[in-house]
UniProtKB/Swiss-Prot annotation:
Binding site for substrate: Y97, D119, I120, K197, D230, I231, W232, E233, H244, R266, D274, W396, R412
Tissues expressing the protein: Highly expressed in the hepatopancreas (at protein level). Little or no expression detected in the hindgut or the rest of the body (at protein level).
Gene: GH7B
Protein name: Exoglucanase GH7B
Activity's dependence on pH: Optimum pH is 4-6.5 for p-nitrophenyl-beta-d-cellotrioside (pNP-G3), and 4-8 for p-nitrophenyl-beta-d-cellopentaoside (pNP-G5).
Family recorded in the similarity comment: Belongs to the glycosyl hydrolase 7 (cellulase C) family.
Length: 448
């Protein structure tokens, strides 16, 4: 998930490689959540990709705009040695990143104009302690949270999801990474993102290509791949939950074909980029979610996801909603030729939705529900983010995509195919926000 931030002032540091600078003391934003009925006092850390990347010797920017400094970074090894990331203090959370928290409530703002910076979107991870991410084991568990997506227009995505990041952010694997989870290192997902400034403890500067439509981002030769369980990708118009699997275990750097980049290599990589998705609008239930819908995006709602095994491996990912004192079962769908409707993600559902929509079943090819089960058993890190889409304008979530298609499954939401241009949403909807709260994990409950 590609997000962007630009800073106009650097910080002083005295470290080498993907290590933490010492000028600014790191502060993690407090956030409470609930495990098995007991409150947990925890915190979140901001992704290292949002941090200032600068020379270890002075305040010279290693990364400026969407390019690496050619003197400090003539090659990746030299860049890794010359450049460092720095801490985020308490005031920077709100003033620079537009992120605030109170109790169990976390609010992410879209565009934040700080004294020295303009921040676009954000991505944070839940911590277990100062140096490690919280690892969630979701099999035979129920995960729930409240979300207010009412202030997210077409083209934005307020997401909550799990990925197979390393608990320590990669410090035990990569000797050049000593910043670790404390500084938000080690992000990965099933898209094998190339926009990470550091991957596997090394600067991703080799082959770096600045984006032609994002003044803050670019792509390097390396990508960072891992399993991804999208619990919630949504704005006020559309939503989905999606399982993505990979043929590799855990955090895996990639290059070349293994990254499965868009185009001819998309299905040749190590991860399933399409995923097996359950999206009510795409499945024909156009009145189920949205402003004034059965699940009304105009007010806060509770999202419940159950990971059911039946005593074995994962066999069902079930979705339930609560709003206004009512329990709302997930929208059901019938595919032609099926006797019984589906209302959850199962192996059979994934086969049938790919068949009906004519999509490549890369989910099955990369491991299917068994692969997802293995990833959940090993544990995953919780991510919350707000972003716009410089590749496809978020049309895959809330509009018709591909834009000229009339085939089943192309209609994914009510938004116009002209919507979602990042330049437009950043200029016209800078005050957009998403709020997550009341995060809980516990035994599976009955909601009949």
């Amino acid at each position: 998930m590609s997000l962007a931030v630009v800073f106009l002032l650097g910080f002083l540091a005295v470290s080498h490689g993907q290590q933490a600078g010492t000028e600014t003391e790191e502060y993690h934003l407090p956030l409470t959540w609930e495990r098995d009925g007991s409150s947990v006092s925890a915190s979140v850390v901001i992704d290292s990709n949002w941090r200032w990347t600068h020379s270890t010797e002075d305040t010279t920017n290693c990364y400026d705009g969407n390019e690496w400094d050619s003197t400090l970074c003539p090659d990746a090894d030299t860049c890794t040695e010359n450049c460092a990331i720095d801490g985020v203090d308490q005031g920077t959370w709100g003033d620079t990143y537009g992120i605030t928290a109170s109790g169990s409530k976390l609010t992410l703002s879209f565009v934040t104009e700080g004294e020295y910076s303009t921040d676009i979107g954000s991505r944070v991870f839940l911590m277990a302690d100062d140096d490690n991410y919280e690892i969630f084991n979701l099999l035979d568990k129920e995960f729930s949270f409240d979300v207010d997506a009412s202030n997210l227009p077409c083209g934005l995505n307020g997401a909550l999801y799990f990925v197979s990041m390393d608990e320590d952010g990669g410090t035990s694997k990569y000797s050049t990474n000593t910043a670790g989870a404390k500084y938000g290192t080690g992000y990965c997902d099933a898209q094998c993102p190339h926009d990470m400034k550091f991957i596997a403890g090394k600067a991703n500067s080799d082959g770096w290509t600045p984006s032609d439509n994002d003044q803050n981002a670019g792509t390097g030769e390396m990508g960072a791949c891992c399993h991804e369980m999208d619990i919630w990708e949504a704005n006020s118009q559309a939503q989905s939950y999606t399982a993505h699997v990979c043929s590799v275990d855990g955090y895996t750097p990639c290059t070349g074909t293994d990254c499965g980049d868009n185009g001819d290599d998309r299905y040749k990589g190590v991860c399933d980029k399409d995923g097996c998705d359950y999206a009510a609008y795409r499945l024909g239930q156009h009145d189920f979610y949205g402003e004034g819908g059965t699940v009304d995006s105009g007010s806060t709602l509770t999202v419940i996801t159950q990971f059911i095994t039946g005593g074995g491996g994962l066999n069902e990912i079930r979705r339930i909603y609560q709003q206004g004192g009512q329990t709302i079962q997930n929208a059901a769908v019938n595919f032609p030729g099926d006797v019984d409707p589906y209302d959850s993600i199962t192996e059979d559902f994934c086969v049938d939705i790919k068949r009906y929509f004519g999509d490549t079943n890369d989910f099955d090819a990369k491991g299917g529900m068994s692969g997802m089960s293995n990833a959940l058993k090993k544990g995953m890190v919780l991510v919350m983010s707000l972003w716009d889409d410089h590749y496809a304008n978020m049309l895959w979530l809330d509009a018709t995509y591909p834009v000229d298609s009339t085939e089943p499954g192309a209609l994914r939401g009510p938004c116009s195919t002209d919507s979602g241009d990042p330049a437009d949403v950043e200029a016209n909807f800078p005050g957009s926000t998403v709020t997550f709260s009341n995060i809980k994990i516990g035994p599976i409950q009955s909601y009949d």
